[in-house]
């Protein structure tokens, strides 16, 4: 089981299937740092941020997008929301900007729609 993105060439987390933990997408791969942007990363959902040699240097000919993609201390903002337990198991909970903009300008979050449908 793994987790990654193109900007991280491509792996962020991985765990062999024999060590799989329900709901987790693995532990951070060697040579990469990960943090959860929250006050309590094991219980409180926050944006996953990564830093390491396999992380891109920036977007080609797009310095503004590059500036927006990184924190002041050089961590890449993944846009993924998640937690990390004390053993380093990463759990993805959603996307930071996962929303649908309706014709009247209202923000609709797919997770809220899914929860309402599941409750029926």
Regions found by a protein language model. Give the residues of each.
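Short, surface-exposed charged micro-motifs
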Residues: 33-35, 81
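Conserved ATP-binding/catalytic segment of the ANL
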Residues: 28, 40-102
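Alpha-helix capping and helix-loop boundary segments enriched in small/acidic/polar residues
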Residues: 9, 104-108
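Phosphate/diphosphate-binding loops
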Residues: 112
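Gly/Ser/Thr-rich phosphate-binding loop
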Residues: 1-21, 33
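Residue-level signal for inorganic ion chemistry
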Residues: 34, 88, 117
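Hydrophobic C-terminal alpha-helix "anchor/cap" residues
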Residues: 82, 116-118
């Amino acid at each position: 089981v793994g987790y990654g993105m193109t900007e991280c060439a491509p792996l962020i987390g991985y765990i062999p299937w024999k060590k799989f933990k329900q709901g987790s997408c693995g532990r951070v791969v060697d040579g990469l740092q990960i943090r959860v942007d929250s006050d309590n990363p094991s219980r409180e959902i926050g944006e996953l941020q990564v830093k390491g040699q396999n992380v891109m240097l920036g977007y080609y000919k797009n310095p503004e997008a590059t500036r927006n993609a990184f924190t002041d201390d050089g961590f890449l903002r993944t846009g993924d929301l998640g937690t990390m337990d004390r053993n380093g198991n990463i759990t993805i909970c959603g996307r930071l900007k996962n929303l649908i903009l309706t014709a009247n300008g209202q923000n609709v979050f797919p997770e809220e729609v899914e929860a309402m449908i599941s409750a029926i």
